[in-house]
């Protein structure tokens, strides 16, 4: 079986220094393959095209920390959730970043494209803030660190991983999670 994943979403799926795709999602997927007594390989795909690639049979299932949403359920089926997550903002430690419409007005906030974080920003703040969407969270973090963004909204575990890095040392979580019941499942073709 071919496991589809993004390979750019640490700590859940990433490419290590040996070029191997590793992370929590792959640990789960490989354990399932072992339990089913089948050989599995890993195929990476850009996030934007990962569901169309699954439906085009480029891989057999997705282990990619994918949120189970009504919109996605129209295109694919999901297993029961294997973990839950939430969305939380990060910004510079010394900033006065607050999470309310008045405080965020005029701020530039980054999120990964085609994710619940990007959707949440658009649904909750729309035109009140400048939303910048990225192909990967890593690109959003680069712009945050270079001063092109005031904050980033992403899964709290993914943000936490970046905050532990050298690049994230001057940043911190801001406020409480804004969405804290994100159910993550393995996606399958219908």
Name each model feature, range by range:
Residues 7, 83-91, 156, 160, ...:
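Periplasmic-binding protein-like
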Residues 7-10, 21-34, 88-139, 156-158:
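Bilobed "Venus flytrap"/periplasmic-binding protein-like clamshell domains
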Residues 10-15, 71:
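Short, solvent-exposed loop/turn elements at domain surfaces
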Residues 26, 30, 34, 39-103, ...:
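Acidic, polar ligand-binding/catalytic clefts
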Residues 37-39, 55-64, 108, 136, ...:
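Alpha-to-beta junction loops
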Residues 72-74, 120-121, 141-146:
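Short, charged, surface-exposed secondary-structure boundary motifs
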